[in-house]
């Protein structure tokens, strides 16, 4: 009798284990099918009008079809301007995306990259150039408004000294974004590589991303 009970107990345990394993697998499959969202705003710091492209990436297809007309998500963005914000929905399992930029007029000067998205991401996609080479970079938006000042961070195409209120606060790194710095004067409170950065088109109390080069400001984008 004891042997029978032991046999039944073992069978029950094995059945429960199989059921729990099955539930776990189902849960993971469900997570992979959940709908996620991301937002991307496109910054064209190049010297020409540009189209920005986005397309879901798969391991098998690579960059195939990225520059097809159907993948344009922000068209005819003027030089040194910010394009529209693109809302992108995807299944959790398909969280890789290809991004590209090209000359709007010629269709040439193509640059591309890929990145992995997180649900709820709010991103800047920046097209920039250094020493004749074009690049795309993706950084997260980060609004940090401060009363009575311009709160700014800088994305640079090289290494430049940054002065705030006449004092050096940092040196930029190529393709990287700095921390935020509080600037109290819109006309001459900020200098990059010896160039005064005019912030007077902005508003006190707001935060901004500045794309800069050796000659100063190229794009000013509201966070």
Regions found by a protein language model. Give the residues of each.
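Structured interaction patches on ligand/partner-binding surfaces of diverse proteins
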Residues: 102-134, 194-223
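Surface-exposed interaction/gating patches
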Residues: 36-49, 137-186
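Bacterial signal peptide processing site
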Residues: 24-27
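C-terminal motif of bacterial Sec signal peptides marking the signal peptidase cleavage site
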Residues: 18-22
């Amino acid at each position: 009798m004891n042997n029978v009970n032991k046999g039944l107990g073992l069978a029950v345990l094995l059945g429960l284990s199989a059921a729990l394993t099955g539930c776990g697998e189902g849960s993971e499959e469900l997570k992979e099918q959940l709908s996620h969202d991301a937002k991307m705003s496109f910054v064209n710091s190049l010297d020409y009008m540009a189209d920005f492209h986005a397309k879901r990436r798969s391991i098998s297809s690579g960059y195939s079809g990225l520059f097809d007309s159907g993948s344009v998500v922000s068209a005819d963005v003027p030089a040194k301007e910010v394009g529209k914000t693109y809302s992108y929905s995807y299944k959790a399992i398909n969280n890789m995306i290809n991004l590209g930029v090209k000359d709007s007029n010629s269709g040439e000067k193509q640059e591309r990259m890929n990145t992995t998205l997180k649900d709820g991401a709010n991103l800047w996609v920046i097209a920039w150039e250094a020493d004749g080479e074009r690049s795309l970079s993706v950084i997260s938006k980060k609004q940090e408004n401060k009363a009575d000042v311009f709160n700014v961070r800088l994305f640079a195409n090289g290494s430049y000294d940054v002065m705030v209120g006449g004092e050096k606060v940092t040196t930029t790194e190529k393709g990287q974004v700095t921390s935020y710095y509080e600037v109290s004067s819109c006309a001459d409170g900020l200098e990059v590589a010896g160039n005064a950065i005019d912030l007077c088109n902005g508003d006190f109390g707001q935060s901004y991303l500045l794309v800069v080069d050796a000659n100063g400001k190229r794009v000013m984008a509201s966070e």
